[in-house]
């Protein structure tokens, strides 16, 4: 009876015994031996199935958000009050007409006093790809009137995800809202990352009274309840502020508390590694303090930084959505997922128009995808971590 080999924690031995994905095992070992740190991280990340799924979901979401005007069937200002709370329409297909839907006319039911829409089966609204529709500016510069999918005739309406109380297309507003909700997480985390790296790096590398001062400041910020502080600062934003100033203010507010955990992680790791031999050798070689931290110390615990940052993005997306949902974040006419969810605050409204909760599904999907990617990056950047299957 043969015994199974005991797995080793040595990263070099893990690379030597790694199973190749395809091709000659010897060529794979040579590739692993000569690969850079980024290449090794990417090789391990590709084996993490859920992380790859999350990555493709995020790529698709950001791609659609970047080209919102093209993918949205209508612009954000396009609304028809007679189509308020129009239910979602499922496209039909025929060989002669292609994709189409039947137009609907709304009326108020006398018995239930509910808004009811009845299809006119004698008429058809033909749908197509790359159709000419309402004009828009791509990236705010390029003028175009082509839409990925929508009615072939100008003026006709089609509601794949239904309509809101103003009669605007929920799908179009969902796509435009992703620009704010998805970008505010990245911008906010970028600000938090810079603050965390600078203050955490100074605190952990120099120590002494500088460390005590920075840590007491961090503890003071962390002792303040997060949600009440966010609510107070967001409520202080004047309602007369424009969309861009409000966006910047909300981003800064969300970043004020996001950097503390990252700074403490960096500080703790620097305290452990600042007296290592390779750091002493760099000092004797005349390397500057900034270069020692950037090139020698930070890469040694990059997995912790990646994990903290990747988990901070969905937290900021949820924070922006919560503030906007409560009316303290982005406000109309600005569009974000939180602003769209304001229409779903009433139980009566949700009961009659459940499709208004679709922006909430988008929030959950983005948060879960970010968590999957964060787990995959953390495991891939840790050479002593267990290889993901």
Residue ranges and their predicted role:
Residues 163-389:
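Alpha-helical transmembrane segments of integral membrane proteins
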Residues 1-193, 197, 293, 333-334, ...:
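Gly/Trp-centered helix-boundary motif
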